[in-house]
A protein has these predicted regions:
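Cytosolic-side transmembrane-helix boundaries in multi-pass membrane proteins
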Residues: 150, 168-182, 253-303
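Membrane-interfacial amphipathic/re-entrant helices at transmembrane-helix boundaries
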Residues: 1-18, 31, 45, 52-58
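Alpha-helical transmembrane segments within multi-pass membrane transporters and channels
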Residues: 54-99, 242, 247
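Transmembrane alpha-helical segments in multi-pass inner-membrane proteins
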Residues: 206-270
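Transmembrane helix-bundle core of multi-pass membrane transporters
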Residues: 97-156, 256-265, 292-303
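Helix-loop-helix "hairpin" substructures at the membrane interface of multi-pass membrane proteins
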Residues: 132-210, 233-238
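Loop-to-transmembrane alpha-helix initiation sites
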Residues: 85-87, 113-118, 135-142, 184, ...
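Hydrophobic core segments of alpha-helical transmembrane domains in multi-pass membrane transport
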Residues: 18-19, 43-47, 97-98, 142-152, ...
Length: 303
């Protein structure tokens, strides 16, 4: 049972990273559907850097930078050229999928040494929960820390208030003297950096190898998590653990030979994602609460 819970916790980490970053981008009014592509670029960059330098911490840095740079491509078109955000995000996912496959081709079949666990003294000795909560890699701790910082930033700081104002009414924010495009560029860049970290976690912790498309739809699940969380950071943790548990059920079912077709088991995380979105959509009041009023709307700065 302990091993199962540990696996659920680890599986939720990349979702926490990616969903937290996307939440910040969406609270600024930008809908970036390219999370999957950014995660793939983060994954391949992390694996390549770790293979070349022999240091997984270089892989973390490379993954974060790759995600941020991929997000900058999105910003160039969606913010700089005012292209449709949905179409641009989908194009970014296709771009990231293709480029990551090309960059990762020489590394197929290789393995790397993953991140070591960092046990927290004294806390790890707590009965039952000590090993479950206080004996993880640095990125697992970082994901929780970033989630808490984002919640504090959005609700307790002036900069967070400005970001939310830009997402709720970019015209009013501009009239008050705020630089809408700069705020959104920063939010999208942060979202890309987080997606890159989420992607980097896959080859550095979960599976110490590179394979094309190894994110396996986690970027889309992260997008659904933001809606599930109603754009509230603390709820992302609950959603990530829920979807992580469903993913582990799928893998456990395949390993134990449940009398269910493997294709049906593989569908479980994505069917759950669709069902959650359908339930939320039917409850219109819940679906709209905390939703940024200008989400996905193009902003053209008046001269």
């Amino acid at each position: 049972m302990e091993a199962l819970i540990l696996t659920v916790l680890l599986t939720s980490v990349p979702l926490i990273f990616a969903a937290t970053g996307e939440l910040v981008a969406e609270r600024s009014g930008v809908l970036n559907l390219g999370v999957e592509g950014m995660m793939l670029m983060g994954a391949v960059s992390a694996f390549a850097a770790t293979s070349i330098f022999g240091n997984p911490y270089m892989g973390i840095l490379a993954g974060a930078l790759a995600g941020a740079m991929t997000a900058a491509v999105f910003s160039l078109f969606a913010l700089g050229l005012a292209t449709n955000q949905v179409a641009t995000g989908l194009a970014l996912t296709i771009f990231g999928s293709g480029l990551s496959g090309l960059v990762g081709a020489p590394f197929v079949g290789g393995t790397v040494d993953g991140l070591p666990n960092l046990a927290i003294p004294l806390l790890i000795d707590i009965p039952i929960i000590g090993n479950l909560l206080f004996n993880h890699d640095i990125m697992a701790y970082l994901s929780i820390g970033v989630l808490g910082l984002v919640a504090w930033f959005l609700n307790r700081t002036r900069a967070g208030l400005v970001l939310r104002a830009v997402g709720n009414s970019h015209d009013s924010a501009h009239a008050l003297g705020y630089r809408v495009l700069l705020v959104r560029f920063g939010a999208v860049s942060f979202g890309g950096l987080m997606a890159g970290l989420g992607g980097a976690y896959l080859p550095l912790v979960l599976t110490p190898h590179w394979s094309e498309g190894m994110t396996a739809g986690r970027g889309w699940i992260a997008l659904a998590l933001v809606v599930f969380a109603s754009w509230i950071p603390s709820r992302i943790l609950v959603g990530a653990l829920l979807f992580g548990g469903i993913t582990i059920m799928q893998l456990a079912g395949q390993a134990r030979g449940w009398a269910i077709p493997s294709q049906m088991l593989s569908m479980m995380p994505y069917v759950a994602t669709i069902l959650v979105l359908v339930v939320i959509a039917r409850n219109r009041r819940f679906a709209l609460i905390n939703s940024p009023a200008c989400l996905g709307r193009i902003y053209i700065q008046n001269k």
